[in-house]
From Swiss-Prot:
Keywords: ATP-binding, Cytoplasm, Fatty acid biosynthesis, Fatty acid metabolism, Lipid biosynthesis, Lipid metabolism, Metal-binding, Nucleotide-binding, Transferase, Zinc, Zinc-finger. The keyword Membrane does not apply. GO terms for molecular function: acetyl-CoA carboxylase activity; ATP binding; carboxyl- or carbamoyltransferase activity; zinc ion binding. Belongs to the AccD/PCCB family. Acetyl-CoA carboxylase is a heterohexamer composed of biotin carboxyl carrier protein (AccB), biotin carboxylase (AccC) and two subunits each of ACCase subunit alpha (AccA) and ACCase subunit beta (AccD). It comes from Cronobacter sakazakii (strain ATCC BAA-894). This is Acetyl-coenzyme A carboxylase carboxyl transferase subunit beta. A zinc finger (C4-type) spans 29-51. Its main location: cytoplasm. The lineage of its organism: Bacteria, Pseudomonadati, Pseudomonadota, Gammaproteobacteria, Enterobacterales. The gene is accD. One of its GO terms (biological process) is fatty acid biosynthetic process.
Length: 306
């Protein structure tokens, strides 16, 4: 036994015991690093109350926060992806699907629901980015078309929240075909004169941005959302030049006229309802009642990991 081990064995120092904090009660802001109470963050729709950073939000949480309580009906839930090409990169596609389905609880990357928004019938779709980066495959395209068909049947507006890395490479040309398929479906909305509002969230890239995500009668973005086709790193490597600060972010795009407006997530529900009421010649909606306040307990030690 070394001299230091003998000294340590004689010491009466007892290790500090961390507080017994349940898993998931606290989290950290992706931007400012502030320790946040999970319940308060959920109440604030995954927007940091300290720096206003808009974190990524699950598809079902988006739709539940948008549509009136008790009005939601899911569409296209029976559609499931198939590994038609028997595709394999470093891992089999069917195994990637199984992992994504287990981790997210979703069958694919797009969730579609119909319901009411301040009493007005609407159809809404939202991407689940945690499902293979929100990539667009055959099921995503089919569900989006189902959303359009339902909006046409109900003679109501369509809203889509995009959060995607683009077309799903594991489905090759079948995924690229969804760009044309979804765009053609939206042409029917235009013929009928029904509003389609596209909400661009972080990130909206690739084949999704090159198709239905940018085809809204109104294209609304969340603050600081990354929106484009190729990513900034790929562009820099290609052109061999440093890109401007904030390139491809929503604030940059609105300056260039590529999008129509930027709306903070907590204000989005009322903003969408107000716009659609105007477009559908309906009475203006009243503001929602304030959400019930959350009592935030003392912040734990900074070295505690949620």
């Amino acid at each position: 036994m070394s001299w230091i081990e003998r000294i340590l064995n004689k010491s009466n120092i007892t290790p500090t015991r961390r507080a017994n904090i349940p898993e998931g009660v606290w989290t950290k802001c992706d931007s400012c690093g502030q320790v946040l109470y999970r319940a308060e963050l959920e109440r604030n729709l995954e927007v940091c109350p300290k720096c206003d950073h808009h974190m990524r939000m699950a598809a079902r949480d988006r739709l539940h926060s948008l549509l009136d309580e008790g009005s939601l009906v899911e569409l296209g839930s029976e559609l499931e992806p198939k590994d038609v090409l028997k595709f394999r990169d470093s891992k089999k596609y069917k195994d990637r699907l199984a992992t994504a389905q287990k981790e997210t609880g979703e069958k694919d990357a797009l969730v579609v629901m119909k319901g009411t928004l301040h009493g007005m019938p609407v159809v809404a779709a939202a991407f689940e980015f945690a499902f293979m980066g929100g990539s667009m495959g055959s099921v995503v395209g089919a569900r989006f078309v189902r959303a359009v068909e339902q909006a046409l049947e109900d003679n109501c507006p369509l809203i889509c929240f995009s959060a995607s890395g683009g077309a799903r490479m594991q489905e090759a040309l079948m995924s690229l075909m969804q760009m044309a398929k979804t765009s053609a479906a939206l042409a029917k909305m235009q013929e009928r004169g029904l509003p389609y509002i596209s909400v661009l969230t972080d990130p909206t890239m690739g084949g999704v941005s090159a198709s239905f995500a940018m085809l809204g009668d109104l294209n609304i973005a969340e603050p600081k959302a990354l929106i484009g086709f190729a990513g900034p790193r790929v562009i820099e490597q290609t052109v061999r030049e440093k890109l401007p600060a904030g390139f491809q972010r929503s604030e940059f795009l609105i300056e260039k006229g590529a999008i129509d407006m930027i709306v903070r997530r907590p204000e989005l529900r009322l903003k969408l309802a107000s716009i659609l009421a105007k477009l559908m010649n309906l009475p203006a909606p009243s503001p929602d009642a304030p959400r019930e306040a959350v009592v935030v307990p003392p912040v734990p030690d900074q070295d505690h990991e949620a």
